[in-house]
């Protein structure tokens, strides 16, 4: 199979996640799991909407309700730029500056920032445990933890856990204590699902596609968004399709060139973008 003589994986196994986390995440996002990193990142962001405080702020800004596609593209561009270029490059520093400026325009509790950060560690890891073409190594799991911890420090997030399992437990406890239905969450989640389906389906067919998106959401998310539980057959179909994809990918030749999402075309920027202009326009 593909991973038995895989150069990127062999390199990962030589790296120290405490200091080589940027290289580990670059290999994950651009070589090993570009599809899975993108999809699980979407699910991580989606998961944060289940916290009423986060959903209410996003609804208040109007970014996810009036400019859903642009807000998605902006998030994708900023995160992809950091993944692909590194923290201390000009592009990486500009991306952090844009992100911090946008966040700094609002009063966001530290515990919400901590939780959002945690989702970008543990949601991708759980996704790849289920749907990845190979298991993640311990170096990759810890590398993602240390990477996001350093990202959190650069975002001025306080009380960052030092331990992988401690942060995971914080994330699980936070969801248990804070996930709840809110009208804002329902609205934002609904618009995002419509956006996802709009990439593939004409408007009149989108209601038929909704159960397939619901199939990717767990029970706490469905309840928080006020969405119905999808039929088991659809959940099974989605699961089988993603696992079949993973099996097929495992037999493909290894990627020779990195897949750079920040260089791809974006619906909101058909003529291209300037990184220092990406994001919300703040007064």
Segments and roles (model prediction):
Residues 1-283:
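Mature, function-bearing regions of proteins
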């Amino acid at each position: 199979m593909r991973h038995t003589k895989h150069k990127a994986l062999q390199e990962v196994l030589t790296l120290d996640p405490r200091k080589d986390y940027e290289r580990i995440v670059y290999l994950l996002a651009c070589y090993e799991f570009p599809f899975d990193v993108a999809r699980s990142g979407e699910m991580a962001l989606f998961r944060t909407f289940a916290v009423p405080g986060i959903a209410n702020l996003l609804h208040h800004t109007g970014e996810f309700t009036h400019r859903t596609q642009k807000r998605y593209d902006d998030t994708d561009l900023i995160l992809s730029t950091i993944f692909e270029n590194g923290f201390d490059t000009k592009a990486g520093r500009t991306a952090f500056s844009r992100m911090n400026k946008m966040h700094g325009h609002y009063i966001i509790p530290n515990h919400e920032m901590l939780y959002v950060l945690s989702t970008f560690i543990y949601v991708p890891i759980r996704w790849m445990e289920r749907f990845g073409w190979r298991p993640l190594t311990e170096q990759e799991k810890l590398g993602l933890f240390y990477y996001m911890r350093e990202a959190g420090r650069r975002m001025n997030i306080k009380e960052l856990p030092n331990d992988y399992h401690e942060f995971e437990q914080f994330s699980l406890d936070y969801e248990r204590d804070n996930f709840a239905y809110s009208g804002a969450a329902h609205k934002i989640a609904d618009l995002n699902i419509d956006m996802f389906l709009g990439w593939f389906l004409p408007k009149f067919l989108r209601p038929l596609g909704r159960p397939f998106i619901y199939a990717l959401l767990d029970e706490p998310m469905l309840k928080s968004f006020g969405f119905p539980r999808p039929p088991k057959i659809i959940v099974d179909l989605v699961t089988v399709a993603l696992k079949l994809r993973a099996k097929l990918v495992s037999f493909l030749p290894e990627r020779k060139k990195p897949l750079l999402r920040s260089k791809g075309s974006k619906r909101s920027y058909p003529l291209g973008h300037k990184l220092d202009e990406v994001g919300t326009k703040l007064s």
